[in-house]
Amino acid sequence: MRLSGESINYVLDLQKKKLPRVYCCSNIERLNDLSRGIIYYNGKVKSKLDESDDEIKQMSTLLIFLDEIRDENIMDIEKNLMSISKKQVVLLDTKGIDLIVNKRNLAFSLINRYNINVIKGTKEEINTLIALQTKEETTNFSYRGFAKRNSCVLIIKGEKYYITDGYSEFYIKNKNEDFPDEDFLDNIYTGIIASSIGICNNKSEIVQSLLISTLAFYIAQENSIGLMKKQFDDSDYENNIKLINEYLLEEISKMDVQEIRAYGDIEYYFKR
């Protein structure tokens, strides 16, 4: 499957025009990386949100990390979830749910009570989340079934990125094995997709933006690795973490329609 040049161009142009504002419920260390992913993909960052109507209306995406929800901030997060409109998008990162037992019921509660548009995690994390609802389905069917039941889009990070809205299934390559700083890489990707979905008004637009931003991220990885290989042996990668990270961000900022369309290899399946 290949995305059309018109759809890619429309999404990238709208991204630059709107500059979606992402509110990150994150610690300072993670926020530093997230901010770079968001800004380099034409978004704006907000780490503190006043309770004024204007502040809430200006927010495009609410980004929540499950492993950062604490007793002292859960009330503020829930207030934000209750205040946002249907035009605003919520992204939940399930990082740590498979390891932190007391976070599982919290995640389940948030999904049941609020409109969570996009849920991201590893296969282990998403499987843990799905197991809270049902244990009867086969793996791929449970991913689609979970997305359909909860009216959300799932992103599963593995050897390939798996994206489903409950009906369509998409697979896009992942190239993170060449990057020594995996946490930085994951935070950048999360920032990119948080920015990308901030322009969306419905689920189909969310899927389209996720496909484009995930492709852009993969291509940026390939390009930055290519630049490194021209200068260093593979053994020197770990000694140049900052440089490869900077190359990645530069390639993200330069991404255009032609480059995404020229690649465009997406595995696609549809089931009712």
Where are these regions (language model features)?
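Short, small-residue alpha-helix embedded
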Residues: T128, D181-Y218
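Conserved beta-alpha-beta core of the PfkB/ribokinase-like small-molecule kinase fold
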Residues: T61-L63, I69-F141
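General beta-strand structural signal in soluble alpha/beta enzymes
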Residues: C24, V45-K48, V90-T94, V118-K123, ...
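Conserved phosphate-donor
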Residues: N140-D181, E222-I225
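Glycine-rich phosphate/adenosyl-contacting loop at the front of the ribokinase-like
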Residues: M1-I39
